[in-house]
Amino acid sequence: VERSRGLGDVYKRQSLYKGAKPVLWSVVEKTALADAEVEYEDHTSNTIYVKFLIKNSTDKDLIESNIVIWTTTPWTIPGNRALAYGKELDYSLIVVEELEEDSLAKINDKLIFASELLENVTKEIGIKKFSTKKKFKGDNLSTCECEHPFKQLGYDFIVKPFHGDFVNLEQGTGVVHIAPGHGDDDYVLGIENNVDIIQTVQDDGKYNQHAVGFEGEHIYKVDHKIADKLEEFSK
């Protein structure tokens, strides 16, 4: 009875709501897992760099340049709805001038990375020569509006960058791609900034109808298809 009254009080205060959040999930057993049930092992992940084209910004120098992210989970790209930067971090806008033969970047690409990671990222991407056009603090990204890299598949919505306390310079590009339905940090940032929380994966590990262009594909087997589509649509 007391529990029912307590629940009633919560309801009266309009503090009771229905929501969703990411949980540890077994696609084999099709059930949620507790932290104590999970054991970690060394695993080699497929990693990709992805460009998000800036279509609008109060900083006109950034328009038509690309914010670049790095991820170890390519399968989460269909669930992307935002980006995260560090507001006090230093970033650079570069223009590509010369490439290695096997690079997927393009001459005259305008790319944005954290300044401290510039040397490492350009080497990994296969950029031999570039010029730096602008240096700025992360807060300059706050007014940017980006295209989703799968816009041509129907992902026709704005992807906005937000400050994230978890963004660091340990690896990657200094910008994190945010899929609010697939990670704790992503979820919290999404809630705080009213970003849509989209679930793209079914209980069995296969994409649902929200992963347009990849419906029915298993997330453990789709990385190369994701990469191929990103290359196809790269501008």
Which residue ranges define each predicted feature?
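Amphipathic alpha-helical
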Residues: 12-43, 121-132, 136-141, 147
